């Protein structure tokens, strides 16, 4: 399964509200993707601990959140389903070196354990997000439900750093990953799909219960479950999430369990 690892799947599932160890993720909980995917040089002493790889699906259906709103352009969603954005991961450069120990001592809702991971972990309630703040001045913001909320949260973190006496700026803000999810509301024959689309699929149910579908255009990774739950990740803009789902939906209907 080149290009996507089981630990990174854990992070994607948790950010989409999926469950690990059979328990749904807590609302607003966040997990960060591997830092190498974000092009951030953090030089951590060790990688953050990863949860063990036991998966189950959400305890509650997401069907209600996937219904079309009256103000949605139906011509762009012929399937009648609009994926819900679950997590936005963004990065920003604060443009100055940071004393992480000082930040952890004086900022609220901040933790720093350099023996585990070389970044301050900071949280704010509105928008409900988590930031990783590195000594280099690079920052990762995760947990927002929209691009605007991610930018707002990143600015709030930068302002907190400024108030602590650092000459923090707000440079090179960039959306690195958008995670969405939806429910097609019918079971899917994953074996048949994997066989017919073997050039794009990885399906190893003994390792991971979902089928991994790597779409070429747009370049999106989809996690497809037998229940009809879908997770989409790898987008830079939300339109890529929507386009990828509309591309895959007719394929999924071909492999609907009867």
UniProtKB/Swiss-Prot annotation:
GO terms for molecular function: DNA binding. It holds the Pfam family TBP. GO terms for cellular component: nucleus. GO terms for biological process: DNA-templated transcription initiation. Its main location: nucleus. Belongs to the TFIID complex together with the TBP-associated factors (TAFs). Binds DNA as monomer. Belongs to the TBP family. General transcription factor that functions at the core of the DNA-binding multiprotein factor TFIID. Binding of TFIID to the TATA box is the initial transcriptional step of the pre-initiation complex (PIC), playing a role in the activation of eukaryotic genes transcribed by RNA polymerase II. This is TATA-box-binding protein. The gene is TFIID.
């Amino acid at each position: 399964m080149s290009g996507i690892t089981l630990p990174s799947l854990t992070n994607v599932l948790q950010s989409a509200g999926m469950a690990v160890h059979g328990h749904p993720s807590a609302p607003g909980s966040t997990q960060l993707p591997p830092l190498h995917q974000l092009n951030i040089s953090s030089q951590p002493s060790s990688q953050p601990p990863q949860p063990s790889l036991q998966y189950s699906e959400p305890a509650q259906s997401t069907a209600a959140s996937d219904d079309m709103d009256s103000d949605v352009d139906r011509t762009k969603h012929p399937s009648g389903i609009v994926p819900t954005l679950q997590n936005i991961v963004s990065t920003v450069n604060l443009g100055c070196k940071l004393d992480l120990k000082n930040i952890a001592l004086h900022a609220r809702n901040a933790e720093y354990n350099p023996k585990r991971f070389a970044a301050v972990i900071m949280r704010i309630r509105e928008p409900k997000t988590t930031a990783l703040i590195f000594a280099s001045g690079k920052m990762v913001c995760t947990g927002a439900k929209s691009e605007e909320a991610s930018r707002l949260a990143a600015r709030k973190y930068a302002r907190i750093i400024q108030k602590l006496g650092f000459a923090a700026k707000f440079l090179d803000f960039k959306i690195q990953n958008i995670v969405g999810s939806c429910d097609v509301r019918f079971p899917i024959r994953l074996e048949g799909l994997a066989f017919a689309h073997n050039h794009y699929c990885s399906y190893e149910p003994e390792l991971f219960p979902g089928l991994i579908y790597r779409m070429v255009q747009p370049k999106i990774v989809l996690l497809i479950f037998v229940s009809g739950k879908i997770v989409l990740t790898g987008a830079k803009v939300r339109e890529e999430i929507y386009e990828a789902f509309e591309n895959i939906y007719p394929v999924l209907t071909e492999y609907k369990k009867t």
